[in-house]
């Protein structure tokens, strides 16, 4: 039985994925990093409505909203397709297509965190290299998800890729998707209406 268990974990992913000691204390408490991402999201939405989409910064904020929504939705679709077991659901990174409530791949929270910062890095990175420090947010969220034994390392890597690609796709649009969907007046920020 032991040889069967070891053989089952000898898939390609198992060379990257490994169980990390559980830690949900202090900064690794999920409510801490979820609160940080939620706070930044609220600030981004408020800033986007205030600024509008006619300025460089305003347009980037609207692209960030698009990117977060696309990243979250894409990750959710991936979870439903791959139904990978989480580390705390058997400690085997090779358990794919398990059905039921196994939604480990890709990490939705890592996707959203990467999607939140990607448009800003793409827009401002060449002008202001310090913008790349925003990568600390998805790095922090991803590390938290692994330390909470909620995701394997490759779940987080895939989540970062989904978020980054969502940011890239959102940044390529001349008019952000949310601006296309909302009434035309939203393009002009609240600050210009006063």
Q: What is the predicted function of each stretch?
A:
Residues 78, 177-181:
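Membrane-embedded beta-strand positions of outer-membrane beta-barrel proteins
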Residues 183-194:
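Outer-membrane beta-barrel "beta-signal"
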Residues 6-106, 110-146:
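Hydrophobic alpha-helical bundle signature of multipass membrane enzymes
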Residues 1-3:
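Bacterial N-terminal signal peptides
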Residues 84-92, 140-171:
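Interfacial helix-loop-helix junctions of multi-pass membrane proteins
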Residues 109, 134-135, 151-152, 180-181:
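Juxtamembrane/interface motifs at transmembrane-helix termini
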Residues 48-52, 124, 168, 172-177, ...:
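Outer-membrane beta-barrel proteins
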